[in-house]
């Protein structure tokens, strides 16, 4: 009997050891979306593309991924509040749009993986050591392509052969001053007079356009950051009312009334950023993932705006357009 009991005990013990452990409930990874320019209510085309790509990669919000949205609606002062909150929530990855958000996130969350998607100058901003080997907790996409600044002004001159005095609209508190400086260098090379026009908030736009009319500027080049991007519809409306042609960086501005844009697709960059998030969630380290630069650029023209401004776009420019907006 004693032998039988011992045998049964041994069998039960062996069975318990062999049985798989009951699976523990896994907490889904938590990512945060951080943007100054994004309106907290209206859909943003950049984040729409980002989230769609995450879905295609198999992530379903509320099931296998948790998403924290922190959109400031152009109010840069809210960044500190957002980041303090995210630090307490222990997010796994922060996805950011522009330079300012990315720099603030890196400073506030030095051990959290950060994926940037629309940063102008990640090296100059101190986000990465170099593009090939970021070397820290930040990686992703940059819009930096030095040839773009000259190309945009060349296209503006092609559309408006008589143009000589051009305004450059930018947010001076943004970290993307490299783009502004490169545009000024390109303007000097092309013999254009370039006037810096600084706008820090939506309330300053009316005064800026009063300056444009007073100084009789003939066109406007827009340097994009989160604040400017969020006000693109208002900027386009004021430009048309001032009969001022605009050269912008991305299609999203042309959709709202900018005359011409030449640059990378923000939607394509957002989709690539989602791929970076996927790689990091699967174990890759930001320090080891090279920062990607855009290689494909799109020329977009708004004929409705051209008509409103009384302009005829040269056929040579129309033939090269990737997209023409007529309505």
Question: Language-model segments: which ranges?
Answer:
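Short hydrophobic alpha-helices and adjacent helix-cap/hinge residues
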Residues: 1-327
